Amino acid sequence: MDERELIRQMKSGDRASFDQIYEKYHVPLFRSAYLICGNREDAEDVLQDTFVTCWLCIGQLRKEESFRYWIFQIMTQAARKRAKERSRQLPDEDIVNRIDQIAVSSSMEAADEYERTSDKTVLEAALSALDQASREVIVLYYYEEMSVREVAKTLGLFEGTVKSRLYFARRKMKKILQEGVRREK
């Protein structure tokens, strides 16, 4: 059964169709939520909020072929809400400390562990240092492999805005990564 048919059935309250949609989308949505939020707990909350909203609001979806953009839009809105809540709790120093911990490892054991996970961890730390809007664009463009047009549609932005955010986010990440390398030496 194709996705459009699943969505039509889901609109009529079919739980099995919802389960199939969940199976298809929960991994990419969780990955994106994790990269946007920066931690597993928030990503799990965002994922849950995303699918609850999806189930409750599926009737508002006009075009079944727009479902992917629609559900990623719900996820990014939930992530924004969670980040706003979290920003009241966590000082910016925590992000800087996290990058410092990743970039500086003195013992051989820590160095070995760093080697095994360095690329992924350093990129995630650099990503977490970006502002929310830049992080969303980077995650959707690179991790979800959406085109600039698709990212713009998902986030409700102009394509030029997406290109601009990508440009400045890349520059900031490059600077963060270069600073991390300098600290290691």
Model-derived regions: residue spans:
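C-terminal edge and immediately downstream basic/flexible tail or linker adjoining helix-turn-helix-like DNA-binding
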Residues: 5-9, 90-97, 122-125, 149, ...
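Amphipathic, Lys/Arg- and hydrophobic-enriched alpha-helical face
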Residues: 22-40, 57, 127, 172, ...
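Helix-turn-helix DNA-binding module
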Residues: 1, 41, 121, 125-161, ...
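Short, charged helix-capping/linker segments at alpha-helix termini
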Residues: 11-20, 30-49, 159, 182-185
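Sigma70-family region 2
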Residues: 11-12, 51-66, 85
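Short, basic/polar amphipathic helix motif occurring as a linker/hinge flanking DNA-binding modules
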Residues: 82-104, 114, 118
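Structural recognition of an alpha-helix C-terminal capping motif at a helix-to-coil junction
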Residues: 31, 45-52, 65-77
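Arg/Lys-rich amphipathic alpha helix in sigma70-family domain 2
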Residues: 59-63, 73-93, 168
